[in-house]
Swiss-Prot record:
GO molecular function: transcription coregulator activity
Species: Mus musculus
Protein name: Mediator of RNA polymerase II transcription subunit 9
Chain residue ranges for the region called Disordered: 1-58
Stored InterPro entries: Med7/Med21-like, Med9, MED9_metazoa
CDD domains membership: Med9-C
UniProt keyword terms in alphabetical order: Acetylation, Activator, Coiled coil, Nucleus, Phosphoprotein, Transcription, Transcription regulation
Record gene name: Med9
Record-linked PANTHER family: MEDIATOR OF RNA POLYMERASE II TRANSCRIPTION SUBUNIT 9, MEDIATOR OF RNA POLYMERASE II TRANSCRIPTION, SUBUNIT 9
Length: 142
């Protein structure tokens, strides 16, 4: 009987796994190496604030118009209040639109700017293709 206990104990020892500190997976990963300055992506440009510091809001007139129509159907005394709310909403948006950049530019000037920007993109793409075709940018295949 004693021999069976020893054999059973050996089997139990064989099935035991080594402590976690000896397992290769439990080693902490090496600290990440800092990227070279050239490899860092450019910082994201901050989103331009809308003029007058306005928040991103939904400027839908549909709810206000719906309220006005409901009040007209019911002959509600709140009709003037809803109409004034709609009127102030229009005024706020007129001010906001007036402060937007480029609103003063005529459509002809906008077309000229668009044409010149497209021309710049075309020439830059051509230059980029030329630079890509140079030998120094080819990556050797191992």
């Amino acid at each position: 009987m004693a021999s069976s206990g020893v054999a059973g104990g050996r089997q139990a020892e064989d099935t035991l796994q080594p402590p976690p500190e000896l397992l290769p997976e439990s080693k902490p990963p090496p600290p990440p190496q800092p990227l070279p300055v050239a490899a860092l992506p450019p910082p994201a440009a901050p989103r331009p604030q809308s003029p007058a510091g306005a928040k991103e809001e939904n400027y839908s007139f549909l709810p206000l118009v719906h309220n006005v129509i409901k009040c007209m159907d019911k002959d509600s005394p709140d009709l003037h209040q809803d109409l004034n709310a709609l009127k102030t909403k229009f005024q706020e948006l007129r001010k906001l639109i007036g402060t937007m950049p480029g609103i003063h530019v005529s459509p002809e000037q906008q077309q000229q700017q668009l044409h010149s920007l497209r021309e710049q993109v075309r020439t830059k793409n051509e230059l980029l293709q030329k630079y890509k075709s140079l030998c120094m940018f080819e990556i050797p295949k191992d």
